[in-house]
UniProtKB/Swiss-Prot annotation:
Pathway terms, separated by semicolons: Xenobiotic degradation; biphenyl degradation; 2-hydroxy-2,4-pentadienoate and benzoate from biphenyl: step 2/4
The gene coding this protein: bphB
Keywords on record: Aromatic hydrocarbons catabolism, NAD, Oxidoreductase
Molecular functions (GO terms): cis-2,3-dihydrobiphenyl-2,3-diol dehydrogenase activity; oxidoreductase activity, acting on NAD(P)H, oxygen as acceptor
Enzyme nomenclature, EC number: 1.3.1.56
Cross-referenced PROSITE patterns: ADH_SHORT
Residues that hold NAD(+) according to the record: 9-33
Identification of the protein by name: Cis-2,3-dihydrobiphenyl-2,3-diol dehydrogenase
Active-site residues, record numbering mapped to chain: Y155
Binding, substrate: S142
Family: Belongs to the short-chain dehydrogenases/reductases (SDR) family.
């Protein structure tokens, strides 16, 4: 187990990618505190993992809730080795022209307060514990932090902001805390949209992402949640990633190497190599 006796705090760990990260960290030997807005999901986590998981109900837009999570994590587990700011919402790729004039202020505030401010507040609250443990932060970014059309201007702008946050905090917190980011691609989860745009009850799983991504990803299919979690384990380990801070891992199925005319360039490799 790569994370034996380590302690992590994950925001938005009650569902989706966050839940998969929690499950993987526990399997790797870690104890995990989870800050999530859903009491029901936290109860499910604790039922699944028992004393290895501590659930804290709260809002990632509120510093006091992050401080409570950090405080309760340290009280229960003695330390924080790794912080994973992960809670987020998606704007369902709504173009600027389609955002209603009377909702754009609220939509901007909602997306940026959850997807950017929520990350910054998490680091602020956990920083003393992370410095004490000489720990690390692993941000969840997105392919939208690097390429267009992974969201609308609200989501894409927010994820680009997180890229800048990784780099700045990697500088500011060195040499005491390592800061890195994982930019996963699409996956079918319960990721919701902004309430200000009437999308609070809409889940990304309602979009046929699997069909859409299979033809455009060089890896040939849409990854499932669990397949993204190894990158978080890698960045959280102390021995293998001691030299690594300020790193941004494009963990998206190869979006950056798609060809202009075809997503993949090696479909006929087995034939050329006479393997079939």
């Amino acid at each position: 187990m790569q994370l034996n006796n380590e302690v992590a705090l994950v925001t938005g760990g009650g569902s989706g990618l966050g839940r998969a990260i929690v499950d993987r960290f526990v399997a790797e030997g870690a104890r995990v505190a989870v800050l999530d807005k859903s009491a029901a999901r936290l109860q499910e986590l604790q039922a699944a993992h028992g004393a290895k998981v501590l659930g804290i109900e709260g809002d990632v837009r509120v510093l006091a809730d992050h401080q409570k999570a950090a405080r309760e994590c340290v009280a229960a587990f003695g330390k924080i080795d790794c912080l994973i700011p992960n809670a987020g919402i998606w704007d369902y790729s709504m173009p600027l022209v389609d955002i209603p004039d009377d909702r754009i202020d609220a939509a901007f505030d909602e997306v940026f307060h959850i997807n950017v401010k929520g990350y910054l507040l998490a680091v602020k609250a956990c920083l003393p514990a992370l410095v004490q443990s000489r720990g690390s932060v692993v941000f969840t970014i997105s392919n939208a932090g690097f390429y267009p059309n992974g969201g609308g201007p609200l989501y894409t702008g927010a994820k680009h902001a997180v890229v800048g946050m990784v780099r700045e905090l990697a500088y500011e917190l060195a040499p005491h805390v390592r800061v890195n980011g994982v930019a996963p691609g699409g996956m079918s989860t319960d990721l919701r949209g902004p309430a200000s745009l009437g999308m609070a009850n809409q889940a990304i799983s309602s979009v046929p992402l699997g069909e859409m991504l299979t033809s455009v990803l060089p890896v040939g299919r849409m990854p499932v949640r669990a397949e993204y979690t190894g990158a978080y384990v890698f960045f959280a380990t102390r021995g293998d990633t001691f030299p690594t801070t300020g790193a941004l891992l494009n963990h998206d199925g190869g979006m950056g190497v798609r060809g202009f005319f075809e997503a993949t360039g090696g479909k006929d490799l087995p034939q050329k190599l006479r393997l079939s």
